[in-house]
Amino acid sequence: MIIVTGGSGFIGSNIVKALNAIGRTDILVVDNLKNGEKFVNLVDLDIADYCDKEDFIASIIAGDDFGEIDAIFHEGACSATTEWDGKYLMQNNYEYSKELLHFCLDRQIPFFYASSAATYGGRSDNFIEERKFEQPLNVYGYSKFLFDEYVRKILPEAESPVCGFKYFNVYGPREQHKGSMASVAFHLNTQILKGENPKLFEGSETFLRDFVYVEDVAQVNIWAWQNRISGIFNLGTGNAESFRAVADAVLAFHQKGQIETIPFPDHLKSRYQTFTQADLTKLRAAGYDKPFKTVAEGTKAYMEWLNR
């Protein structure tokens, strides 16, 4: 059996899809379906069972026997960078992850988890997987940073794979439930379908992010499991592109509309990453050699999926 936490969420459901593609359907999805919209991400996927997150945590703490587990992909967390309830974030993103990590270590179960580029904070270069380059700007980033630090201390003694991925700007199918936290490509497409012009913040041609297509993210996770990879790795394309490039790709697909600019919100100015670009040196050195989709390629594929 394979367990995917956050399995009805954005990245989790894409990992389930990738597992299905290699013939694995013996999958336990763990999630919180309080946001009932997420169920649609599982409708076309094959899984063996579903477990509520709270029940799962209780079972983990109790040391319950789940039978033979080949791997746990831990994608379940609060991913809202705008969430400021620190107690909630630390419980949800840090304590839960520690419990699951030790459950895996005790049983030598390969453990793969979601970290984030938010751990780097507002830096404009050297996005390198080391403590000295990490300075998160928000509580979400701090919760991910602290778990990375916890893992770093444990890795030298771990007898089974423990692997974290610092996800950069992930976009693509199955993110529709995320609301305001969905990608800019999703929101621009929605605006055009409503008959509106797509809107970008002022200066968006200078805001550069490492936009990575979610199917590529899922493939890296599968590769890490199949190759028993351990460590903490950046997961982006290695190339920063502008929000304007995303908008241009959306407009190219729809063949209509023109970009409108709107004022940049004051409350985000000190907490906004204006540049991100994954340094892939460590991931490539570990053996991952497949190319990543560009913004033009990924956005085109995403638009075809959204407008199918």
UniProtKB/Swiss-Prot annotation:
The UniProt entry's GO biological process terms, in alphabetical order, are:
ADP-L-glycero-beta-D-manno-heptose biosynthetic process; carbohydrate metabolic process
Arranged from A to Z, the UniProt key words for this protein are: Carbohydrate metabolism, Isomerase, NADP
In this chain, NADP(+) is annotated as bound at 10-11, 31-32, 38, 53, 75-79, 92, 144, 170, 178
Cofactor, free-text remark: Binds 1 NADP(+) per subunit.
User: Matching SUPFAM superfamilies, A to Z?
Assistant: NAD(P)-binding Rossmann-fold domains
Which Pfam families is this protein grouped with? Answer: Epimerase
Keyword Secreted among record annotations:
no
Cofactor(s) named in the record: NADP(+)
Q: Which reaction does it catalyse?
A: ADP-D-glycero-beta-D-manno-heptose = ADP-L-glycero-beta-D-manno-heptose
**Pathway(s):** Nucleotide-sugar biosynthesis; ADP-L-glycero-beta-D-manno-heptose biosynthesis; ADP-L-glycero-beta-D-manno-heptose from D-glycero-beta-D-manno-heptose 7-phosphate: step 4/4
Q: Which domain of life is it from?
A: Bacteria
InterPro entries tied to this protein: Epimerase_deHydtase (IPR001509), Heptose_epim (IPR011912), NAD(P)-bd_dom_sf (IPR036291)
**UniProt key word Repeat:** no
The residues responsible for catalysis, as annotated, are: 140, 178
Q: Which annotated residues bind substrate?
A: 169, 180, 187, 201-204, 209, 272
Q: What is its EC number?
A: 5.1.3.20
A Gene Ontology molecular function term for this protein is: ADP-glyceromanno-heptose 6-epimerase activity
Q: Its biological function? A: Catalyzes the interconversion between ADP-D-glycero-beta-D-manno-heptose and ADP-L-glycero-beta-D-manno-heptose via an epimerization at carbon 6 of the heptose.
Task: Please give the subunit comment from the record.
Answer: Homopentamer.
Instruction: Give the record's family classification.
Output: Belongs to the NAD(P)-dependent epimerase/dehydratase family. HldD subfamily.
**PANTHER family recorded for this chain?**
ADP-L-GLYCERO-D-MANNO-HEPTOSE-6-EPIMERASE, NUCLEOSIDE-DIPHOSPHATE-SUGAR EPIMERASE
Description of its domains? Contains a large N-terminal NADP-binding domain, and a smaller C-terminal substrate-binding domain.
This protein's name = ADP-L-glycero-D-manno-heptose-6-epimerase
Q: Which organism is it from?
A: Glaesserella parasuis serovar 5 (strain SH0165)
